[in-house]
Amino acid sequence: MKSTEGMFDESVIYVTKQGTQVRTDGGRIVVWDVEGDGGELATFPTEKLDTINVFGGVNFSTPFVAEANEHGIILNYFTQNGKYRGSFVPEKNTIAEVRRAQYALDETTELDIAASMIAGKIRNARTLLSRKGVYGTDVLKDLGVRATNVETKDDLRGVEGQAGERYFSRLDETLTDGWTFEKRTKRPPEDHINSLLSLTYVFMKNEVMSALRQYNLFLGVLHADRHGRPSLALDLQEEFRPIFCDAFVTRLVNRGVIDHDQFTQDNHLSDDAFKTYCGKFDDFMQEEFTHPYFEYTVSRRKSFRQQAI
């Protein structure tokens, strides 16, 4: 199906069909079936996009990459089953004054910012549990207070670790019958809930990277600098993990959107289920809510950009 102007409300698209190429044609971005006989599959106005996510055997034409750089469009690369591989961040997104201020942060200011993020993460974890009818979480409230009174980043990481352990020990209580969660596992995730959590954290990280395009993504305030790791995006994402990522996963399974039989033996989503996931994730990011501080309606996607500012 070819797209029309009204098919999307936001600025992010997902290309999952294997054997396709993303091209540019007369001020529009075109997804073309190069291995089959589908021809033009979709088309979007260039000026309305700022992020394109591609999965597996999807490639970009050289003229399109130049166009993406000119228009400030971020390109994120994933394997076919959603494992993040890398990103192209255009030079146009760099603003010298913003980065100069970022580089000038001293250790005390960095700690204050990091502590605020982790306190927000713990508060949001408690909020999610409360919304799902899970109570007896005063220990999280206490840890949230402790997070704002630490003296070092190592102390803050210790508080975060304690809060995470307490929070995940109660997450199972938010799930409907037929789903269980014992502990957080990664690389590889050992069950279906952990698989969905890992996938959602990757998708959310790339949303945050788009919001932080004017900054140096590799210079964070909490996560240690490591070659190739977008530490600043991981920092900003922390506060949103429970209330956006974990809430999205519980919604998927509790509403029956995703079921156990849609996973492969290695706990990855099947191709059809993955397409469903991408669509639901984008819908979720476009949903609006009343911002707790600004008190006006904003989409989840735009809330990242406000937080980045």
Whereabouts are the PLM-identified features?
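Active-site helix-to-loop segments that bind/position phosphate- or nucleotide-bearing substrates
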Residues: 1-27, 32-35, 43, 95-309
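Internal mixed beta-strand/loop scaffold within catalytic domains of large alpha/beta enzymes
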Residues: 23, 30-56, 60-62, 70, ...
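A surface-exposed, charged beta-strand/loop segment in the N-terminal or early-internal portion
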Residues: 48-127
